[in-house]
């Protein structure tokens, strides 16, 4: 009787091994579910990024405002008649223009 119990216990263990640790076992399924959830999060972020880029492309293709905004922010362009004002924090040294630079006169400073 004791031998039969041991044999049945070993058989039960052999049957349970593929269920828990085998190729399609619970641990593998759990790990794959975790990977799928992480990929869903990544995909959601990429979908939001794609939607924003698509809206920007659509705006650039149809609207002048987006092109103007990009030219101002990325290229530093201004409209005619606008005045550029740059605020320099106190204590920052003011760069001196190079000799012969445009806008600098060769005459002595005025008094």
UniProtKB/Swiss-Prot annotation:
Ranges of the Cytoplasmic topological domain: 1-3
Positions of transmembrane segments: 4-21
Keyword annotations: Cell cycle, Cell division, Cell inner membrane, Cell membrane, Coiled coil, Membrane, Transmembrane, Transmembrane helix
PANTHER family reported for this sequence: CELL DIVISION PROTEIN FTSB
Protein name (record): Cell division protein FtsB
Keyword Transport among record annotations: no
Membrane topology: Single-pass type II membrane protein
Top-rank lineage group of the source organism: Bacteria
């Amino acid at each position: 009787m004791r031998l039969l119990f041991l044999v049945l216990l070993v058989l039960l263990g052999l049957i349970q091994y593929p269920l828990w640790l085998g190729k399609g076992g619970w641990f593998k399924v759990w790990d794959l579910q975790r990977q799928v959830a992480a990929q869903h999060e990544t995909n959601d972020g990429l979908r939001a990024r794609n939607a924003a880029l698509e809206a920007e492309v659509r705006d650039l293709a149809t609207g002048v405002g987006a092109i103007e905004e990009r030219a101002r922010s990325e290229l530093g362009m201004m409209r005619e008649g606008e005045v550029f004002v740059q605020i320099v924090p106190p204590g920052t040294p003011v760069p001196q223009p190079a000799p012969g630079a445009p806008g600098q006169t060769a005459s002595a400073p005025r008094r």
